[in-house]
């Protein structure tokens, strides 16, 4: 279950989890730290709010939603990413998060982050689909043993009717969505 504070879906997911008979250990819950919650203390506070809203004791995966950028944070973007990551590492070491990662980080963002990271990101959730394979970012992540998780893996709806994708899917006995 992919959530994020900025999506506004944590409360609804939390209510659904509470009302269901699903055992917590049988589901994988991801959430993301939003851009305004940067720095060590803000990250820890945002995480506490997220698990309270979801009604869970831990997250399976917690991601920094976007890299801090110079335009938004002036010259403090790398410092804020590092402080934020340090809080994520501490939450991971405390057992409150099973895996930590980033979202929308490109190789140059990861290079900067890993200069201060004790624990490297375990996941980089990026937009990847047949129409935008992001080969450089995928290769970088693979070379650094960082799992790539695709957001928008189907890309545009037209991917489902793309002739090349349909041919590949048929060849492998799959649907176009499964190939994407």
Go through the PLM ranges and name each one.
Residues 2-27:
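N-terminal binding-site loop/beta-alpha segment at the start of enzyme catalytic domains
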Residues 43-64, 90-94:
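CE4/NodB-like, metal-dependent polysaccharide N-deacetylase domain
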Residues 24-37, 58-67, 125-128:
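A short, structured active-site edge motif that brings together acidic residues
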Residues 10-17, 44-51, 85-89, 107-111, ...:
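Generic structural signal for well-ordered alpha-helices
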Residues 33-41, 71-77:
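Active-site mouth loops of central-metabolism enzymes
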Residues 67-180:
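Beta/alpha (TIM)-barrel catalytic core signal, keyed to glycine-rich beta->alpha loops juxtaposed to Asp/Glu
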Residues 1, 59, 100:
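Glycine-centered flexible beta-alpha turn that most often forms the glycine-rich phosphate-binding loop
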